[in-house]
Curated annotation (Swiss-Prot):
Family label: Belongs to the PlsX family.
Organism: Burkholderia multivorans (strain ATCC 17616 / 249)
Coiled coil: none
Main location: cytoplasm
Gene name for this UniProt entry: plsX
Key word Transferase present: yes
Name of the protein this chain belongs to: Phosphate acyltransferase
Pfam family, any one: FA_synthesis
EC number, UniProt record: 2.3.1.274
An example Gene Ontology molecular-function term: phosphate:acyl-[acyl carrier protein] acyltransferase activity
Function: Catalyzes the reversible formation of acyl-phosphate (acyl-PO(4)) from acyl-[acyl-carrier-protein] (acyl-ACP). This enzyme utilizes acyl-ACP as fatty acyl donor, but not acyl-CoA.
HAMAP family registered for this protein in UniProt: PlsX
Length: 368
């Protein structure tokens, strides 16, 4: 089976200078992949020519005349730039010409346009960015990592349901454990949104283990950690900054003297393994969960190596049938949760807003 993906080549801080080289390298390593490069045709062709890949049959150019800038308001991306590389790439997924879209573009715009073009799964009001973060024994699924800066309690419950379904589908766990990210484990901690979300989670049939703190993220305390997009994005980027700082400190210390340089040579295999484990670029690419099609969000600042990993996330998701498995697990979970009988003022599948697909407002999204 050929895996067909659309690439928003104009998205991110660096545009085609990063996205096109990453795409070329990816198809050369994955002969069953076909990438549709969406964007300003002349800019894409210039990069392909430089890479001697103009005639590569695994790559095709899909012209788009507009670009969603990283600082564009959601309304501009959604209502004015209807021929943007982001919109065209998503339209090809909607029309069945590709199985997933990968973009490093403006997060808020990507969330809003994806939601409008592709629609959400039944019972889901807002998509959430989800990713598996490493822990000592495996991975912890965390969401939301930046799609929704302001959330209501029922949105956090829905994120938990999606995280539960994804872990159940991919890892075969019947009862994945759920934690709510907070400033303390006690139920009295947190703002009113967090407290109310905790009440909804405790009242649900999910395997909710209570509040978790920031230092639990990489411990493997629970299978799924739920938070709003503001908190999740700050936590993620803080982690990346810390990993980079540790790498820089080790490099600096081993370069201080001739003796330390000799020690570095002896320790080189260990140092290389350490560098690989803490290199956040290999963790680039997070799924926008809750949509009827697959969308992978890359960091806007990603280099070609990191963006290639984002493409791989989309490729692997298609190969592993993630969307189909998630949809089935969500349907099964909806039945187990009582088909929306949460006492949440509209939380869960019975929410009057669930499944509503009017154009989202800027207040619901972030641009980070």
């Amino acid at each position: 089976m050929t895996v067909k993906l659309t690439i928003d080549c104009m998205g991110g801080d660096h545009g085609p200078s990063v996205t096109v080289p990453a795409a070329v390298k990816f198809v050369r390593a994955h002969p069953d992949a076909h990438l549709m490069l969406v964007g300003i045709e002349s800019a894409i062709r210039a990069q392909l020519k430089k890479l001697k890949a103009l005639d590569d049959p695994a790559l095709s150019i899909v012209p788009a005349t507009e670009v969603v800038a990283m600082d564009d308001p959601v309304e501009v991306a959604l209502r004015k730039k209807k021929d943007s590389s982001m919109r065209v790439a998503l339209n090809h997924v909607k029309d069945g010409e590709a199985q997933a879209c990968i973009s490093a573009g403006n997060t808020g715009a990507l969330m809003a346009v994806s939601r409008y073009v592709l629609k959400t799964l039944p019972g889901i009001e807002r998509p959430a960015i989800a990713f598996s973060l490493p822990n000592p024994t495996g991975y912890t699924m965390m969401l939301d990592l930046g799609a929704n800066v302001d959330c209501e309690p029922q949105h956090l419950l829905q994120f938990a349901e999606m995280g539960h379904a994804l872990v159940a589908a991919l890892e075969g766990k019947d009862r994945p454990t759920i934690g709510l990210l907070n400033i303390g484990e006690e139920v009295i901690k947190g703002n009113e949104t967090i407290k109310r979300a905790g009440e909804l989670l405790r009242a649900s049939t999910l395997n909710f283990r209570g509040n978790v703190e920031g230092n639990d993220i990489y411990k493997g305390t629970v299978d799924v950690i739920v938070c709003d997009g503001f908190v999740g994005n700050v936590a993620l980027k803080t982690s990346e900054g810390l990993a980079q700082m540790l790498s820089d400190i080790i490099r600096e210390e081993f370069g201080r003297s001739l003796l330390s340089k000799l020690m570095a040579l002896l320790a080189l295999p260990v140092l290389m393994r350490f560098k690989k484990r803490v290199d956040h670029r290999q963790y680039n690419g997070a799924a926008l969960l809750g949509l009827k099609s697959l969308v992978i969000k890359s960091h806007g600042s990603a280099d070609a190596y990191a963006f290639e990993w984002a493409i791989k996330r989309g490729y692997d998701a298609v190969k592993n049938g993630v969307l189909e498995r998630l949809t089935r697990a969500m349907a099964d979970n909806s039945v187990s949760l009582g088909d929306g009988e949460h006492d949440a003022g509209g939380a869960g599948p019975a929410s009057p807003a669930a499944g509503h697909h009017a154009e989202p407002s800027a207040a619901q999204s972030s641009k980070a």
